[in-house]
Regions:
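Carbohydrate-binding surface patches
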Residues: 224-228, 233-246
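Short, conserved phosphate/pyrophosphate- and ester-handling motifs at nucleotide-, phospho-/glycolipid
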Residues: 62, 188, 318
Length: 484
């Protein structure tokens, strides 16, 4: 077995986040290091086909694949998908996005919602099997919307292929440069697609150049669109370089603004913005934003609270799914408490959403977040909601916890994808709280941290997941831990 060899096989399962486990057979004479029954295939007397397991990403259980060996590290093999020879029995979904297969955004649109939930639940059980063998798993709660659920999209300007026409949308699957014009995207409200199409058509008609990421020349970079699920308020933010004369730019942007204001939208376009970004990185960066029309913010409602959102705010991208998630966090935090907690720590608090949801049931909530802009937003939203018992501190949890005067009765953990710093988790354990609620968007990081917490005397009492991002690999997990 060597790199470049081409095999066929069946996907037996998919491990989190998108690692298809493929069983393939190869002729004994070509097996090389592949083992079968303790013996290397190809040795004298072995004429049976060898079975080999290969990881092929972005696949679905039950699919028959043709793939090439891309990496070989000892007994570990990774393949690159060449062709799907036969669909899986799980692929029975109707009304599939027209961009599925090209666009790199969704993996599982051809699977039914029920099949997606079953697959993700199985992934969680496999991950937790060794760390929590007696796991009390309460199930995978679905997003209230399986389509049109996202409240934010960052579309990229580029070419559909090298030296091809301008496109505006998502990166083509497996490509850093090619862009798919995702004007029929199914995971956003149709208003998003109207803004995208109008923007692309307008700048195409004007002959405006897009930013070439290799040559670092051009004007158009990104289109950021937000739409609140509850209020219907929308923001459209055009991100460009400064590679245009001021007078020409003002006329160009005025025409774009008028184009959007004339659109027949179901929601209300509350603000049209222009952001400058001359950084080399292919990421949205705010180097100065001006309001072309309306307001620089929109408002969204979650569990009876109101949140102000800018184009660049960190806010859960599925508002209705966030209500399910945060509802479970609140349930776990307050379950069977004899009295309300005096002090709650919300560590890695982001824009303070969880802290504010729990504020009515505590004397004080202290949020700690390393991103200063998020802390400022949290303070502003707490004022907006009339919550005077929330304190938000900007800083690294690893350092800030050393200076916190209060002793918490309850700790909420909602860290970034990679989990909690090993030194920080030791300091969190040292508070000795009876109850911790851990919220995670990456279960592989979660199980690593749970092992540390369990070794320190905590026990996982309840666990559930929320399918926050249907048709993608994303899973949100909530764990209730109590000190033994």
């Amino acid at each position: 077995m060597k790199k470049g060899d081409i095999l066929e096989g069946i996907v037996t399962r998919v491990d989190f986040p998108n690692r298809g486990i493929v069983e393939a057979e190869i002729p004994a004479e070509g097996a090389g290091a592949a083992k079968t029954d303790g013996e290397k295939a190809g040795e004298a007397g072995n004429t049976e086909p060898a079975k080999v397991t290969v990881i092929v990403k972005n696949t679905i259980p039950g699919q028959k694949l043709r793939f090439s060996i891309a990496k070989k590290r000892g007994d570990r093999l990774e393949g690159r998908l060449l062709e799907t020879l036969a669909a899986s029995e799980l692929e029975k979904a109707e009304d599939v996005c027209p961009h599925f297969g090209e666009c790199g955004g969704c993996l599982y649109q051809t699977m039914t919602g029920k099949a997606q939930l079953s697959m993700k639940e199985a992934q969680i059980h496999r991950l937790f099997r060794d760390v929590c063998p007696d796991l009390h798993f309460e199930g995978m709660f679905d997003s209230p919307l399986l389509q049109e659920y996202r409240n934010k999209m960052e579309f990229t300007f580029g070419d559909a292929y090298k030296d091809g026409p301008m496109a505006l949308g998502m990166h083509r699957r497996g490509s850093f440069y090619d862009i798919v014009t995702a004007d029929g995207c199914r995971i956003v409200h149709p208003d998003f697609n109207k803004v995208l199409s109008a923007t692309k058509d307008y700048f195409e008609a004007q002959g405006t150049p897009f930013f070439h990421r290799t040559m670092h020349t051009g004007y158009l970079r990104h289109l950021l669109v937000r739409r609140a699920q509850k209020t219907g308020e929308m923001l459209a933010c055009l991100v460009t370089t400064t590679q245009m004369e001021k007078e020409a730019e003002e006329a160009l942007l005025a025409g774009w603004k008028d184009c959007l204001l004339a659109l027949p939208l179901e929601g209300r376009l509350a603000g049209i913005l222009h952001t400058k970004n001359d950084s080399v990185a292919d990421a949205v960066k705010d180097e100065g934003t001006e309001v072309l029309s309306g307001s620089p913010v929109i408002h969204e409602e979650l569990l009876g609270l109101t949140f102000e959102i800018t184009p660049f705010s960190f806010f859960q991208t599925n508002s209705l799914g966030a209500e399910v998630l945060y509802g479970k966090v609140r349930e776990y935090a307050l379950e069977q408490l004899e009295e309300k907690p005096e002090v709650i720590f919300d560590l890695y608090s982001g824009t303070g959403t969880i802290a504010q949801i729990l504020a009515p049931v505590a004397k004080k909530v202290v949020g700690v977040e390393i991103v200063e802009e998020a802390v400022l937003a949290a303070r502003k939203n707490a004022d907006l909601n009339g919550l005077s018992n929330c304190e938000f501190i900007a800083g690294d949890v690893l350092k800030v916890v050393d200076d916190l005067a209060e002793k918490p009765d309850l700790i909420i953990l909602d860290p970034p994808r990679d989990g909690i710093h090993p030194k920080a988790i030791g300091k969190i354990i040292a508070f000795g709280v009876k109850r911790i609620v851990y919220v995670s968007c990456k279960p592989t990081s979660l199980v690593r941290d749970l092992e540390i917490l369990q070794n320190a005397g905590y026990r996982v009492e309840r666990t559930c997941c929320v399918n926050m991002f249907p048709s993608t690999s994303g899973i949100e997990t909530v764990c209730l831990l109590e000190r033994r």
